Amino acid sequence: MAFSFKSFFGGADDEEEEYEDSGYEQQPNQGQQQPVNSQQQNTSNQSYSGYNNQNQNRNGFAYDNGYRQQPKMSAVNSSTQSANNSAKIDSHIALFVPKVFSDAKTIVNQLLLHEAVIVNFSAIDETQSAKIVDFVAGAIYAVEGSIEKISDEIWLIAPNNYAVSGSGSAANSMGRNARF
């Protein structure tokens, strides 16, 4: 019993179709262009990268030496890499004692430079210090930072690149009877 693909796939009753020859084996008539396959095009003097640096090895095969060698990549532990990056960052904390409301701009400028500020309100009255805290709170919201009340007159203002932990945040400690 002979195995037939046509009978297996149900094509035993199908008519056979004849396909024309693609013409690669025929000699072209004069005036007609000869078909060119893609391998014949690749043996020209130009490489894909645009360099004219093709050489032939001892077997006669053409190769392109115009490529640029990529730098070697090595796997780096992400925790080591982040530790190295954090060591390179210069972190500063500015200490500031405002005397007038216009000093709030200096505090906000430090915050915009991604630097934390410790503000001592001992040299200014309560209404002015409350206005400064309100002004700075808007900037803190804009940069997604945080504000922490350290004592009645001292506040820590930090941008989002500082992690502040501990109890007694400004939002929790402020009430109707709070100074600010």
From Swiss-Prot:
Residues 24-57 have a biased composition (Low complexity). GO terms for biological process: division septum assembly; FtsZ-dependent cytokinesis. Residues 12-23 have a biased composition (Acidic residues). It holds the Pfam family SepF. It is found in: Cytoplasm. PANTHER family: CELL DIVISION PROTEIN SEPF (PTHR35798:SF1). HAMAP family: SepF. Homodimer. Interacts with FtsZ. This is Cell division protein SepF. It comes from Oenococcus oeni (strain ATCC BAA-331 / PSU-1). The lineage of its organism: Bacteria, Bacillati, Bacillota, Bacilli, Lactobacillales.
